[in-house]
């Protein structure tokens, strides 16, 4: 058991946790050394290794992580997007990989903007196909070299990308089935409701009957 004191708070970590972090640190140093300037930074966060990679080098980095025996990150888990509107390159594209051989996960991040496409990961991991379509649909992030980059979750003709921070919570249109026209119709969002007059001054009258068990408190 190892004890670490931070701001007066003592945290104790098991030997397994310490050894796991040491293995992650060694893996991070190995990958950063092998990929060189392709990796701009790396860190260990919540027991997982996180790499930040240049967008133009993402295919090269993913290929190394998959094929290098010391890494063997061959399980492609997911791709997701993150939106930071205050940044010039507002989007993070995050790749999640798993190595069954080393019982280790790695998170690879690429920064981009709405106009700069990220090279598609399909040549390395074919399963990236639908993940990239989903990321494009929800964030508007472009992927160059994708064979069929079109929306996946939203409807035909949908405007905007719903997981961007500047997308309104209500959306732009509402969808309903019109009984008279016997079809689905799209209309502008309407949040108005009928005027309601709330009476806050009348006292609560309660009930005029006794519920089972209440007779004990009244007596």
Curated annotation (Swiss-Prot):
Keywords, alphabetical: Cell inner membrane, Cell membrane, Membrane, NAD, Quinone, Translocase, Transport, Ubiquinone
GO MF entries: NADH dehydrogenase (ubiquinone) activity; NADH:ubiquinone reductase (non-electrogenic) activity; quinone binding
Its EC number(s): 7.1.1.-
Membrane topology term: Peripheral membrane protein
NCBIfam families noted in UniProt: NuoC_fam, PRK06074.1-1, PRK06074.1-5
Role of this protein: NDH-1 shuttles electrons from NADH, via FMN and iron-sulfur (Fe-S) centers, to quinones in the respiratory chain. The immediate electron acceptor for the enzyme in this species is believed to be ubiquinone. Couples the redox reaction to proton translocation (for every two electrons transferred, four hydrogen ions are translocated across the cytoplasmic membrane), and thus conserves the redox energy in a proton gradient.
Similarity comment: Belongs to the complex I 30 kDa subunit family.
Entry protein name: NADH-quinone oxidoreductase subunit C
Organism annotation: Methylorubrum extorquens (strain PA1)
């Amino acid at each position: 058991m190892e004890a670490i004191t931070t701001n007066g708070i003592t945290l104790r970590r098991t030997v397994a946790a310490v050894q796991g972090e040491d293995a992650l640190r060694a893996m991070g140093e190995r990958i950063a050394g092998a990929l060189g300037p392709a990796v701009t930074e790396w860190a260990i966060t919540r027991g997982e290794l996180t790499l930040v990679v240049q967008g133009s080098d993402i295919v090269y980095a993913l290929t190394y992580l998959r094929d290098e025996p010391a890494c063997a990150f061959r399980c492609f888990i997911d791709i997701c997007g993150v939106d930071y509107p205050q940044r010039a390159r507002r989007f993070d594209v995050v790749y999640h990989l798993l190595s069954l051989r080393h019982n280790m996960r790695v998170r690879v991040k690429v920064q981009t903007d709405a106009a700069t496409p990220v090279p598609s990961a399909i040549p390395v991991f074919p399963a990236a196909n639908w993940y990239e379509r989903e990321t494009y649909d929800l964030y508007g992030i472009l992927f160059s070299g994708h064979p069929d980059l079109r929306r996946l979750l939203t409807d035909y003709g949908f405007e905007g990308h719903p997981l961007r921070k500047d997308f309104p919570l209500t959306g732009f249109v509402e969808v309903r089935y019109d009984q008279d026209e016997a079809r689905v119709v799209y209309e502008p969002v309407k949040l108005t409701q009928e005027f309601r007059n709330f009476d806050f001054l009348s006292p609560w009258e309660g009930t005029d009957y006794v519920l089972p068990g209440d007779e004990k408190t009244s007596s």
